[in-house]
Amino acid sequence: MPQQWLPPIYWDGDAVAILDQRLLPQREAVIRCTSPKQVVAAIKNMAIRGAPAVGVAGAMALALGAVLIQAADARTFKSKFARLCRQVRTARPTGRNLGWAVDRIHALVEGNRDADVPRLHELIRREADLILAEDVAGNVAIGSWGKTVIPRGAGIMTYCNAGALATADYGTAVGVIRAAFDADPGIRVFSCETRPFLQGARLTVYELMKAGIPVTLITDNSIGSLMSRGMIDVVVVGADRIAANGDTANKIGTYMAAVLACTHGIPFYVAAPRSTIDASLPDGDGIPIEQRAPKEVTHFNGRRVAPQGAAALNAAFDVTPNKYITGIITEVGILSKPFGRAIRQALKA
């Protein structure tokens, strides 16, 4: 049976409330942010994560910060607001949605030349709310499109967490799973644990169980074995940034899963809103890859598991070349190869 759900981010009066995903699934605790600096900190320390959710958080941080700016006139306000936009934009580098949301609100402010400061406050808050609402509606549409590629009784594998916790609600890849399950409760879902931060084990399994959808947790290094045994029929993952040719940055290990899926003839789909597409990048070579602290690899639950002094690489993302991707599921339809042309058309829709 579905359980009560706490959204990952929402307004709590004049504060931004963020569900602390670092504590899940053991504890549900909310961080109440009263300044944009607190929201940025929550993004950086991964209390909130997932490209669409981070984009929404960035928009809400701007709305929160706008009313704190002391400015006697619109010109002064816009100058200070531009500085705030730069601070929020750089919170995490790989995901496209944060920069997209910040640029969208900044352009709105710059485009309203006759608005006074109170009016600008109103416009910023309204746009942040619209970004949140659009994300949820887009995710539901992604799910509706995505369920059409899921065979009846299929074994679906997903990686990391591209669910309600990674968005404003409902989810992208997990949104496809939700919609597929509603249409066919006979599907089987496999969630990779996703080391080292264990987003699959901690978050995807948590929210699927909350939704009443049966799920089996698997180790990352069992993907090939399960595929070879015919247990996986389709793979659906999310995305943090998609280049103009369809190359896709997602959680580290996605590339490995895509290669294995291709080897075994298994369809591999990326589910993401158009706001994740970065048309300024011709291919995945230009996608910035966030490097996180080695301690996330050398320690587990605060305890060292590697020898003292051991070196560790901890790239948070990798890039899957478009040749391994069967299709990109967006809110306006499923994009097929050649992705360059399909992406250009989707961005015009």
Swiss-Prot record:
Give me any GO biological process, just one: L-methionine salvage from methylthioadenosine
Q: So what EC number does this one have?
A: 5.3.1.23
Catalytic activity annotation: 5-(methylsulfanyl)-alpha-D-ribose 1-phosphate = 5-(methylsulfanyl)-D-ribulose 1-phosphate
Q: What InterPro entries does this protein map onto?
A: IF-2B-related, IF-M1Pi, IF_2B-like_C, Initiation_fac_2B_a/b/d, M1Pi_N, NagB/RpiA_transferase-like
Q: Which domain of life is it from?
A: Bacteria
Pathway per the UniProt entry: Amino-acid biosynthesis; L-methionine biosynthesis via salvage pathway; L-methionine from S-methyl-5-thio-alpha-D-ribose 1-phosphate: step 1/6
Locate the residues binding substrate. 49-51, 92, 199, 250-251
Keyword list (alphabetical) reads: Amino-acid biosynthesis, Isomerase, Methionine biosynthesis
State one molecular function term (GO). Answer: S-methyl-5-thioribose-1-phosphate isomerase activity
Active site annotated at which positions? 240
Q: What class of enzyme is it?
A: isomerase
- Positions marked as site (Transition state stabilizer): 160
Explain the purpose of this protein: Catalyzes the interconversion of methylthioribose-1-phosphate (MTR-1-P) into methylthioribulose-1-phosphate (MTRu-1-P).
Family classification = Belongs to the eIF-2B alpha/beta/delta subunits family. MtnA subfamily.
What is the official name of this protein in its record? Methylthioribose-1-phosphate isomerase
What organism does the record attribute this protein to? Syntrophobacter fumaroxidans (strain DSM 10017 / MPOB)
